[in-house]
Amino acid sequence: MNAVSMATPVFMILMAFGNLFGIGGCAFISRSLGAREYERVKKISSFSFWGAVFVGLLATLALTLGVSWILPLVGADASANIANISKDISGDAYDKLVQNYQNLEQYTRDYLFYIGVGAIPTVLSSAMSNLVKGEGAAKVSMFGMMIGAVTNIILDPIFIFGLDMGVTGAAAATVVGQLASLGMAMLFHYRWDKEIRRDWKHIRPQWGLIRGIYAIGIPAAIMQGLLSVMVLFVNLVFGTQGDMAEPLQAAYGIYYKIQPVSYTHLRL
């Protein structure tokens, strides 16, 4: 549970990068369609698509090859956590805490690795679900997210308990859920979409186009990214609390997951 809490903010940061291209591209596509600038729509969608792929590729490299540098940032570095154990704790209690922190580091490492392997579909799913909204296909976006969520819910117990994969099963289920969501968006793109493109010939950098996407995409990404950074910071602070660190981090992880439900109605 704690490993998932440690790694979830990283996953949300990936989603924020998807929003950078998705929400920015969505708004720009809507304006361009209204102005009947169809050639610009092709350029916007191509840039957003391949931009998301590129960022996802960088995230894959960072999370699979550089995970050892990321662990301290998310509060899962065993040596740092062990150093914060109170000197009043000794014997079996100390050994148990050391083992718990070592397990936490390994589980978080495994979870982040799987998230890294699935970084491209994660970022691209977030981007594409927003891009199709730009064409007015909000239902397609909604169904895609629902399919991804349901797939994740179904596969979690199968991977975690049925296949005895543990925390890596939770990560694998999350990645497969993102693939399912992306699959819905791509199905719409291939079968019914007439405007969104992903052709290389349309991704030549143009400052006006990039500025139009980032003008809306960057604020959207920052809003979600700052929330994840806040959670990372809180986990680091809790990590200094010695033997109380794990229960504090676990409790905050649960709160972080259910907290968005409390204001969902405000988005309606």
Where are these regions (language model features)?
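Alpha-helical transmembrane segments of multi-pass membrane transporters/permeases
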Residues: 52, 131-154, 168, 172-175
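Residue-level signature of transmembrane alpha-helical cores of multipass secondary-active transporters
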Residues: 12, 115, 141, 212, ...
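Small-residue-rich hydrophobic transmembrane alpha-helices
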Residues: 3-60, 122-141, 251-267
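Interfacial/gating helices of multi-pass transporter permease domains
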Residues: 1-12, 103-107, 167-168, 209-216, ...
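Generic alpha-helical transmembrane segments of integral inner-membrane proteins
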Residues: 17, 53-65, 120, 124, ...
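Short alpha-helical transmembrane segments in multi-pass integral membrane proteins
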Residues: 29-118, 162-218
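Helix-terminus/linker motif at the lipid-water interface of multi-pass membrane proteins
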Residues: 1, 71-78, 92-99, 158-164, ...
